[in-house]
């Protein structure tokens, strides 16, 4: 067949085994095996390129076949399979190249458009900053002396900070961590525990909570089911805090929040549907703890967290929602990034993008990381490489644009609504107090100290030594779980193929803990089996140790053993985000050989204690190991360098830099907390009518409050207003109203009249009606059925109602009155897709509704304002241009219902409008942060603040007014607006009304990046369904059932 000659030639070589290659030309592997075999050569080349274990199995079966004809047929079939695999890989490479080209063009276009708004005052100073890159990056001085540290401590002692860290997956506990037990319980677990412990010991920090998942499964230790665990401080920071100053709730704690299946330990890829449940549980803990701390250290004022720090994508997603719900700053550490993993998997060519998404939930993970970038004040990375080669893959971060925006902010110049998180490199810390490197080696006895004159060898030493026939040889140590990305098999190949290295050294592989290979995960067992086969293949018995078990307390002793033998630590991972084990090894006096991809580059730059290698080149790995093992002078120099510079990676150093970054970031907290009802304590209690009359005078005229454009229209008629500045007046007037409203805000004081609180605070149950669609299409009939289902409890007032919708308040008012409803039928109105919040007045003498004057300050974080609006208008015009010059405007601004925090647009043809993910991507590339929602059967689009939504509005009601989320029952249709998924999950009850949706609503979700099952678990006991027809009795029945769950 044409184009297949290369397959035929290989096939002929395999079937007709000829003389071997010259020794000088053949690889060391082939020379050691003896006679050259094209069969083996061909298969090895394919395995090297594709890592396809199935091909190797096919080859083994073909070799075992006795019949020549059958053998040849199998070999031929194998070659055709390889050819197909090669074609698939080529196709994936072409698709990847096209994707990269498209992204590069999008990025360049986004930069141009973002710069266009800022071009009129772009200065040479900004250009200099862009050119010099990091030269302007302020660098905090490192603490290199005890005096400097003591000075810093004295400055911090008066502070009493509350910090929240989040790390969801894996098994987390303070002592005897089971690192390596599975792929989720690795370096991140150790890092977050030690970070929490270190921060809890810092002056100025009162309490640190590390939030994680509570696991009450019989498959794991009981300790993971304990709600709270205090982290005992280490005596390693040198701080002399007086114990008398420590309060009742001070210190560092692991707090385990129950969410997801109560009796199962599940992998991180399966946690995504349960994130909303965690957020609600965490929100409850933080609010309650903030109140407790307020009583202890805040003079009765709530002490909110100074920051919420999410670790990895799942915790980042959670931290973003918590940050929005509480209005406090968020920090992010990615640890391992989804886009980078996707790139690596696509390069391997073994899986399609759909397969990758199904296996790793990669698109859900990437969107969580993008949202985390939207919400984060600071992104903490371990290395510059993580910023330059990994974070730059994301729509929400552009290093070039970030430098421009930072320069403008320093000069006090407008950024036109654009925001970019600050990337900060803070290497992880380590405890060094208990590390005492041995001075002796295995060739001579170590000098006995006075403190330990006859100290016995640790048991783990004997466990390792039993593998070796010559245990005194230098030990090459690798400590990593059996994961393909850790590249352990290449290390074993390098060791096995290099005879001089085998003669000089032993190899120790600490690959986590295991009982039986069959009990391991398929991936881990596959790696371990490959290692065992390679040991057998190269006959490495007596030269390689691979113990089955070790404790976390044994790890320092393993490092000491390797250093005692004058060995080398190696990390051959394809990519290492940081490389904490490299720092641990250096602290124990071990030189290193490490991958040149990732964090080890920065570690080597600081410590200068080893060599970097290409992890794909096994020859270079073998050469580097041999060089360090054979050259004792080089070994000694690397050891001394590592020990001399290791203090730069201490936990006090890390924590000081960490806290300094938080202090320099923009601080925010709930609006009512800062104002805290000034002056109320010195005033006489107001009567209900007086308290509401002040608010009425300012805002209870609905036509003025919600539709200030009428005022502008009047001014235009009088010739006093131009079109150019009308929008600016609207925004400033709206802000002025809300500032005035703050003077008449609801009081938090319990001794005030009950009428100052929204009515829903008195309810035993709250029905939230969030059914989407067209209000003229019978949706109000459903509202009546829900009212009827509440029955006498509605009349008695034990059940309250909240209407949650994409419509504006004037539209809702018109619809309600036209359908015979009263505005007092609902206690609250969540309008404009969650960007507006109103309450029913409790005094019949007053007007109907009251705006929550604190809500806008709660959701305005990173709101682009007029700069965002202008960009959206340009985007709308570009949609029309793409459809032809004669085409009518596809999408137009709806000024009638737009507000200061919701830009509304009319869509005339939804088939010509791209999905929401494309618009959000375009805005992110231009550093504009927003939440885009297609609503009202696709006829409207609302653009609101990035952390605002209808589900977040419910969390606000809990934080602001103490309304328990578990008391809420949210009613939704079978489908809804594009924010529909956020309403389903959480601790509240959800009732899905089957049949309440239409084709238009379903089409809004047709272009999702991931299925609904990656967002919410419809099997949750908090979710129930009512069959098509939705009778009042059925609704009442399902609510009763859910309440008992």
Curated annotation (Swiss-Prot):
Biased composition (Low complexity): 664-674
Activity regulation, per record: Activity is regulated by phosphorylation and moderated by concentration of metabolites and light.
Keyword Glycosyltransferase tagged: yes
GO aspect biological process, one term: sucrose biosynthetic process
Superkingdom of this protein's organism: Eukaryota
Pathway the protein acts in: Glycan biosynthesis; sucrose biosynthesis; sucrose from D-fructose 6-phosphate and UDP-alpha-D-glucose: step 1/2
Residue ranges with Basic and acidic residues bias: 93-115, 124-137
Keywords from the named record: Glycosyltransferase, Transferase
This enzyme's EC code(s): 2.4.1.14
GO terms of molecular function: sucrose-phosphate synthase activity
Reactions that this protein is recorded to catalyse: beta-D-fructose 6-phosphate + UDP-alpha-D-glucose = sucrose 6(F)-phosphate + UDP + H(+)
Annotated tissue distribution: Predominantly active in tap root.
Family that this chain belongs to: Belongs to the glycosyltransferase 1 family.
Function, as annotated: Plays a role in photosynthetic sucrose synthesis by catalyzing the rate-limiting step of sucrose biosynthesis from UDP-glucose and fructose- 6-phosphate. Involved in the regulation of carbon partitioning in the leaves of plants. May regulate the synthesis of sucrose and therefore play a major role as a limiting factor in the export of photoassimilates out of the leaf. Plays a role for sucrose availability that is essential for plant growth and fiber elongation.
UniProt name for this protein: Probable sucrose-phosphate synthase
């Amino acid at each position: 067949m044409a184009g297949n000659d290369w397959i035929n030639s290989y096939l002929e070589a395999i079937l007709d085994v000829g003389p071997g290659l010259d020794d000088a030309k053949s690889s060391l592997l082939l020379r050691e095996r003896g006679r050259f075999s094209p069969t083996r050569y061909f298969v090895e080349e394919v395995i090297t390129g594709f890592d396809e274990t199935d091909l190797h199995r096919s080859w083994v079966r073909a070799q075992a076949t006795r019949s020549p004809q059958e053998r040849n047929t199998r070999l031929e079939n194998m070659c055709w399979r390889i050819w197909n695999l090669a074609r698939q890989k080529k196709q994936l490479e072409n698709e990847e190249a096209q994707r990269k080209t498209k992204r590069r063009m999008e990025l360049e276009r986004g930069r141009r458009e973002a710069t266009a708004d800022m071009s009129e005052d772009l200065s040479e100073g900004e250009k200099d900053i862009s050119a010099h890159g990091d030269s302007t990056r302020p660098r905090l001085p490192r603490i290199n002396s005890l005096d400097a540290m003591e000075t810093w401590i004295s400055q911090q002692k008066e502070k009493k900070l509350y910090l929240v860290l989040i790390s969801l997956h894996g098994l987390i506990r303070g002592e005897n961590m089971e690192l390596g037990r599975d792929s989720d319980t690795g370096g991140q677990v150790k890092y977050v525990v030690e970070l929490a412990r270190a921060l809890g010991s810092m002056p100025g920090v009162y309490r640190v909570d590390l939030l994680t998942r509570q696991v009450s499964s019989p498959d794991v230790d009981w300790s993971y089911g304990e709600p709270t665990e205090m982290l005992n401080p280490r005596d390693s920071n040198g701080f002399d805090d007086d114990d008398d100053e420590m309060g009742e709730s001070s210190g560092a704690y692991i707090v385990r929040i129950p969410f997801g299946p109560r009796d199962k330990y599940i992998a991180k890829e399966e946690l995504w549907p349960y994130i909303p449940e965690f957020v609600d549980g965490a929100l409850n803990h933080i609010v309650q703890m903030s109140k407790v701390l307020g009583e202890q250290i805040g003079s009765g004022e709530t002490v909110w967290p100074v920051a919420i720090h999410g670790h990895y994508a799942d915790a980042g997603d959670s931290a973003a929602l918590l940050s929005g719900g509480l209005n406090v700053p968020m920090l992010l550490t990615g640890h391992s990034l989804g886009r980078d993993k996707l790139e690596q998997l696509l390069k391997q060519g073994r899986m399609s993008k759909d397969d990758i998404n199904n296996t790793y939930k990669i698109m859900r993970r990437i969107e969580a990381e993008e949202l985390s970038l939207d919400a984060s004040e600071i992104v903490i990375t371990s290395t510059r490489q993580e910023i330059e080669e990994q974070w730059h893959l994301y729509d929400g971060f552009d290093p070039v644009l970030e430098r421009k925006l930072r320069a403008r902010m320093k000069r006090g110049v407008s950024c036109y609504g654009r925001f970019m998180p600050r990337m900060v490199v803070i290497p992880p810390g380590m405890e060094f107090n208990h590390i005492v490197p041995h001075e002796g080696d295995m060739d001579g006895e170590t000098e006995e100290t006075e403190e330990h004159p006859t100290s016995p060898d640790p048991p783990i030493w004997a466990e390792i030594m039993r593998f070796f026939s010559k245990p005194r040889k230098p030990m090459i140590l690798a400590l990593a779980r059996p994961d393909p990305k850790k590249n352990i098999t290449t290390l074993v190949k390098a060791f096995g193929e290099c005879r001089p290295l085998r003669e000089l050294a032993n190899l120790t592989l600490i690959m986590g803990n295991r009982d039986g290979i069959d009990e391991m995960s398929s991936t881990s067992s596959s790696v371990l089996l490959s290692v065992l086969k390679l040991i057998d293949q190269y006959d490495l018995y007596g030269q390689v140790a691979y113990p089955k078990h070790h404790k976390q307390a044994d790890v320092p002793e393993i490092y000491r053993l390797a250093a005692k033998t004058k060995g080398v630590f190696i990390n051959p991972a394809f990519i290492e985000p940081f490389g904490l084990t490299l720092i641990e090894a250096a602290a124990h006096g071990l030189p290193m050989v490490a991958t040149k991809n990732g964090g080890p580059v920065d570690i080597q730059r600081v410590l200068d204690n080893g060599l970097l290698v290409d992890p794909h080149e096994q020859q270079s790995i073998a050469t580097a190991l041999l060089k360090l093992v054979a050259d004792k002078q080089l070994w000694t120099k690397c050891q001394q360098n590592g020990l001399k510079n290791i203090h730069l990676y201490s936990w006090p150093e890390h924590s000081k830099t960490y806290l300094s970054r938080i202090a320099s970031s923009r601080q925010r907290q709930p609006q009512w907390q800062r104002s805290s009802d000034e002056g109320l304590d010195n005033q006489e209690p107001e009567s209900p009518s007086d308290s509401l009359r002040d608010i009425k005078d300012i805002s209870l005229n609905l036509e003025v409050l919600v539709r200030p454009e009428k005022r502008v229209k009047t001014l235009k008629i009088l010739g006093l207003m131009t079109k150019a500045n009308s929008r600016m007046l609207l925004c400033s007037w709206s802000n002025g109203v809300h500032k005035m409203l703050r003077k008449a805000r609801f009081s938090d004081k319990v001794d005030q009249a009950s009428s100052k609180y929204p009515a829903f605070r008195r309810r035993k149950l709250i029905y939230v009606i969030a059914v989407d669609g067209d209000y003229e299409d019978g949706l109000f009939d459903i509202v009546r059925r829900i009212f009827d289902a509440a029955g006498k409890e509605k009349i008695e007032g034990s059940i309250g109602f909240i209407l949650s919708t994409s419509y504006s308040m004037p539209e809702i008012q018109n619809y309600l009155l036209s359908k015979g409803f009263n505005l007092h039928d609902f206690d609250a109105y969540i309008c404009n897709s969650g960007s507006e919040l109103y309450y029913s007045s409790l005094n019949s003498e007053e007007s109907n509704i009251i705006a929550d004057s604190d809500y806008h300050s709660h959701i305005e974080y990173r709101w682009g304002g007029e700069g965002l609006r202008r960009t959206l208008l340009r985007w709308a015009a570009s949609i029309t241009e793409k459809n032809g010059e004669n085409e009518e405007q596809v999408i137009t601004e709806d000024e009638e219902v737009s507000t200061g925090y919701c830009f509304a647009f009319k869509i005339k043809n939804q088939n010509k409008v791209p999905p929401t993910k494309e618009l959000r991507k375009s805005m992110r590339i231009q550093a504009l942060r927003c939440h885009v929602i297609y609503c009202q059967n696709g006829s409207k689009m609302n653009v609101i603040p990035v952390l605002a939504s209808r589900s977040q509005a419910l969390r606000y009601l809990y934080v602001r007014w103490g309304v328990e989320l578990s008391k809420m029952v949210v009613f939704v249709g079978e489908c809804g607006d594009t924010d529909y998924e956020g309403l389903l999950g959480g601790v509240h009850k959800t009732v899905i009304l089957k049949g309440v949706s239409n084709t238009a609503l379903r089409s809004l979700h047709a272009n999702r990046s991931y299925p609904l099952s990656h967002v919410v678990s419809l099997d949750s006991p908090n979710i129930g369904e009512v069959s098509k027809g939705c009778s009042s009795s059925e609704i009442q029945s399902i609510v009763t059932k859910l309440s008992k769950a």
